[in-house]
Design a protein with these regions (language model features):
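Acidic catalytic motifs of isoprenoid enzymes
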Residues: 1-183, 190, 194-231, 239-252, ...
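Conserved functional acidic sites
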Residues: 278
Length: 283
């Protein structure tokens, strides 16, 4: 479900793209340092965005280092790390841990049980350190599972589960920015969930998997409706973002929120246009 909150590279300045990658590599390294190889496997673009957002908002002191890694062994990579990077790494691991726990409880996936056991020790310590976030992640994923079991077509209910999850992750500190960050995260989370459901719908139909958009997709105006809903969700999120006094890396943040989040949607539309052309040629 993650991977939608990333940069639009063609619209980003070279220096900003380098800095974005340094944040991404910094999060990757922190995951490895704090949680080992399995923690590193939970790396997401979405939590990289959270690192940049919260680092900008709280003007956190960030250290710059250069390291080699297995992915890029030939050349040292720029890496940016701070205390928020550690927080984001912890949230990555919590999300992965609870997701694997749900997979085991619901579907008895042996692979999930085995992977979960590899990070369980450190995940338990993280749960103790972040009880507020841990409880919301657990409850939100549980309710999402209930939506799936009930085959609920209530789009707002399903998307709201993931919205509340993201809202909690954005609240690093319970302070004056908490309310704005919650709302921003809530609507961004709903956007992520709905974009994922929109992208997965054709495959979910083929494999008879749960997708809350199946009923809406029967309407002739489905495509227009989905675009409108997605635009509403991201608009509500960006309105809250613009209320935050973010100055550092604001061009990167705006690139992600106004352009990057649409990367997958634009690819889907391009593929649909190409498919339509192929169909017309075959007639």
């Amino acid at each position: 479900m993650f991977g939608y909150v990333t940069v639009c590279e063609p619209e980003l300045k070279v220096k900003d793209l380098k800095k974005y990658r340094a944040y991404y590599c910094g999060l990757c390294r922190t995951l490895k340092e704090d949680y080992g190889f399995m923690g590193q496997m939970t790396l997401t673009y979405d939590m990289t965005f959270a690192v940049i957002l919260l680092s900008s908002l709280y003007e956190t002191t960030t250290k710059h280092e250069e390291h080699r890694c297995k992915v890029h062994p030939a050349k040292r990579q720029h890496m940016l790390q701070n205390e928020i990077t550690s927080y984001a790494a912890a949230m990555n691991v919590l999300l992965a841990y609870y997701h694997m726990e749900d997979d085991w409880q619901d579907d008895r996936k042996v692979s999930s049980l085995m992977t979960k056991s590899l990070i369980q020790g450190k995940a338990k310590k993280t749960i103790e350190k972040y009880p507020r976030q841990s409880e919301i992640i657990r409850k939100s994923l549980k309710e999402l599972g209930e939506c799936e079991h009930e085959n609920s077509m209530d789009i707002d209910r399903a998307a709201g589960c993931f919205g509340r999850l993201m809202a909690e992750l954005f609240v690093w500190k319970e302070d004056i920015w908490e309310k704005t960050l919650r709302k921003m995260g809530f609507y961004l989370g709903k956007f992520i969930y709905l974009m994922d459901a929109y992208e997965d719908l054709p495959e979910d139909r083929k494999k008879n998997r749960y997708n809350p958009l199946k009923e809406l997709a029967k309407r002739p105006d489905y495509e227009a409706q989905m675009e409108q809903i997605l635009r509403m969700m991201i608009a509500e999120s960006t309105v809250r973002f613009e209320r935050l006094p973010c100055l550092v890396d604001v061009d990167i943040l705006r690139n992600i929120l106004y352009d990057g989040v649409w990367n997958h949607y634009n690819k889907i539309q391009m593929k649909k246009r190409e498919d339509n052309k192929d169909e017309q040629k075959s007639i």
